[in-house]
């Protein structure tokens, strides 16, 4: 089950874009160097990371639809990621456990992508999720989030022009099993 939620207003989007424009990004494989499928850039500045993560997580938690759907116990810090032409993230499932600093871990039941660019500003770059024999594609308006089970096979299609800027995070839900969560929602 997927949930699309409008979580960011124009001023929040503008602030996140400004953070991204003024902070350094590095090869996304810095957090997973053995992942050959990952070809993107991620924010690499502690102060900008903290500010953008707080803004994104506060926006998510402010929405009753998100809280009712995800039933979060814990949410990983949100990370800004950028895709420029030629970049993609091949088919994968997200890690079952996310290590949190300085200690601990989070069971990743749900993944969340928050779109920060309008879809017309870049070509390609859709988030595609495998659902049995079907594929669902998401390229949402800026300010919208898509929440989906972390164990579903998904990918970011290659960006062919423009720039795809998103925030990503992972959620540990009160209800681990996606089928049980769907029945409750």
Per-region residue spans from a language model:
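Non-heme Fe(II)/2-oxoglutarate
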Residues: 1-79, 178-185
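Catalytic core of non-heme Fe(II) oxygenases with the double-stranded beta-helix
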Residues: 65-184
């Amino acid at each position: 089950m997927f949930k699309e939620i409008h979580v960011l207003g124009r001023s929040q989007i503008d602030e996140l874009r400004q953070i991204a424009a003024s902070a350094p990004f590095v090869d996304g494989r810095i957090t997973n160097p053995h992942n050959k499928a990952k070809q993107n850039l991620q924010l690499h500045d502690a102060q900008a990371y903290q500010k953008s993560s707080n803004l994104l997580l506060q926006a998510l938690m402010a929405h009753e639809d998100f809280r009712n759907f995800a039933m979060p116990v814990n949410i990983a810090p949100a990370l800004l990621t950028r895709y420029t032409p030629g970049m993609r993230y091949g088919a994968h499932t997200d890690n079952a456990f996310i290590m949190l600093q300085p200690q601990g871990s989070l069971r990743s039941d749900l993944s969340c992508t928050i779109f920060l660019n309008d879809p017309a500003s870049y070509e390609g770059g859709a988030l595609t999720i495998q659902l049995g024999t079907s594929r669902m594609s998401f390229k949402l308006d800026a300010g919208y989030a898509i929440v989906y089970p972390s164990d579903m096979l998904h990918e970011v299609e290659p960006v062919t022009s423009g720039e795809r800027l998103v925030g990503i995070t992972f959620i540990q839900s009160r209800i681990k099993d996606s089928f049980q969560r769907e029945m409750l929602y």
